[in-house]
C-alpha cells in the first residue's frame, strides 16, 4: 500500500522519502546473525530495534522532513510498542526507550485477522520464521500454534495502542484498490493543511 501511495504522491508533485523498519546498516548484520543463531532475547530485540530506529531518525527521517519531504514509514514506534510488550517487556519502559521519536502526523494500523495474516505469509514462503512465530517465548511446541498465540498478543497490544494514541484503522482484508482509495482520502486533508498537527508517539 505504501508503494502505491508513494507513487501517487510523487505524481501529485510531492517529494517522498520511504523508511523501512529494521533497515539501518548499523544493526542489520547483528540482527541477522542473532536471528540465525536464535540468540536474541526480548530485551535484546528492544535495544536493537531502538538503535535501528534512532539511526534512521537521524540519518533519513529528520533530514527529509527538514527538506520538506513527506516521509512514509513502513512501521513506526508502534511496531516496537506492540511486539516488545507481546514478548513480555515492560510497556512503560518500551515507550521511554522511544521518547526521542519524531511525532508522526498520521499513523495507520492495517487490521487483519490472524487466519488471513497466516495465509498470506504461507502463500509467499514455505514456513514461518522462528521469531515471527514467537518460538523463543515457549508458548507452544507447534510453530503454527505458537504463531497464533504470539500474533494474538501483538494484535491485542495494537488495539490498546489504537485507543491510547488514536491511530487510524484500515481494514486490510479489503481489495487493494479500495484500501488505496481510502488511504488517499485519509491523507488528502493533511496535504491541504486542513487536518490537525502531529499525534503523540
What function would you assign to each model-found segment?
Residues 19, 110, 170:
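Hydrophobic residues at beta-strand termini and immediately following loops
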Residues 80-153:
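A glycine- and Lys/Arg-enriched "phosphate-lid" helix/loop adjacent to the NTP-binding pocket
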Residues 14-102:
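ATP-dependent small-molecule kinase phosphotransfer cores
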Residues 4-6, 122-201:
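NTP-dependent small-molecule kinase module
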Residues 1-11:
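A conserved segment at the C-terminal end of the G1
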Amino acid at each position: 500500500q505504501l508503494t502505491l501511495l508513494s507513487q501517487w504522491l510523487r505524481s501529485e508533485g510531492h517529494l517522498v522519502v520511504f523508511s523501512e523498519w529494521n533497515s539501518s546498516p548499523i544493526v542489520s548484520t547483528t540482527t541477522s546473525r542473532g536471528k540465525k543463531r536464535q540468540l536474541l532475547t526480548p530485551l535484546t530485540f528492544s535495544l536493537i530495534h531502538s538503535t535501528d530506529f534512532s539511526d534512521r531518525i537521524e540519518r533519513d527521517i529528520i533530514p527529509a522532513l527538514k527538506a520538506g519531504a513527506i516521509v512514509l514509514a513502513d512501521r513506526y514506534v508502534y511496531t516496537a510498542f506492540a511486539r516488545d510488550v507481546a514478548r513480555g517487556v515492560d510497556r512503560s519502559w518500551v515507550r521511554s526507550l522511544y521518547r526521542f521519536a519524531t511525532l508522526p502526523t498520521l499513523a495507520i494500523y492495517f487490521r487483519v485477522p490472524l487466519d488471513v495474516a497466516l495465509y498470506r505469509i504461507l502463500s509467499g514462503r514455505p514456513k514461518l520464521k522462528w521469531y515471527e512465530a514467537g518460538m523463543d517465548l515457549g508458548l507452544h511446541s507447534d510453530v503454527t500454534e505458537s504463531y497464533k498465540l504470539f500474533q494474538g498478543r501483538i494484535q491485542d497490544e495494537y488495539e490498546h495502542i489504537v485507543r491510547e494514541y488514536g491511530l487510524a484503522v484500515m481494514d486490510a482484508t479489503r481489495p487493494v484498490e479500495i484500501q488505496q482509495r481510502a488511504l488517499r482520502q485519509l491523507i488528502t486533508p493533511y496535504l491541504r493543511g486542513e487536518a490537525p498537527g502531529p499525534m503523540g508517539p
